[in-house]
Amino acid sequence: MAKPNPEELFNLGMLSYDKQDFSKARKYFERACGLNNGGGCGALGDLYDDVEKNLIKATQFYSKACDLKDGRGCGSLGDLYENDQGVEKDLIKAAYFYSKACDLNNGGGCKNLGVLYHNGEGVEKDLIKAAYFYSKACELKESFGCGALGGLYYSGDGVEKNLTKADQYFSKACKLGDQEACEVLKEK
């Protein structure tokens, strides 16, 4: 029988993870990561972040995942820098890793970068850029990005005020599971 390739190892790891067999999942992810599979490295980061609570190791694996062009790994690394977890809080680095994640089509990275631009954290406040990153997040089916973009259209911040577009984005956010957006639609 042929040796499993990195993608197969990652998939086997995910099956084990879903069954809550974290020990077995870690072994598969370690093998996948050792073969330079970004998803395997990112999943190892998740294990150390969420299950084993070792943020130093989580940071190392997210960093390797990001280096291997895994958008989720870049986004998770950005989260650690934004939230002062395992690394010193650094919003400039958070923005950098969210930008990398977004460039790799990670919706969460785009959304988080939009939030940083919206609030002027780690980057200069820029509602036009916030709208751009929320829009990209929404295209990638990130519910918060759709809802936040709807909010910008509703208020006319960073984009021309357009209540029809606001409702369209709130509706998309609601369909993607954003309860706050669903509530906004109910109030109309």
Segments predicted by a language model, with ranges:
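Terminal, low-structured helical/coil segments at or just beyond the last alpha-helical repeat
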Residues: 2, 172-188
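Short helix-capping/linker turns of helical repeat alpha-solenoids
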Residues: 4-5, 16-17, 34-38, 49-51, ...
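Hydrophobic face of amphipathic alpha-helices that form TPR/SEL1-like repeat modules
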Residues: 9-18, 43-51, 76-83, 112-119, ...
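N-terminal segments that cap or nucleate solenoid repeat domains
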Residues: 1-43
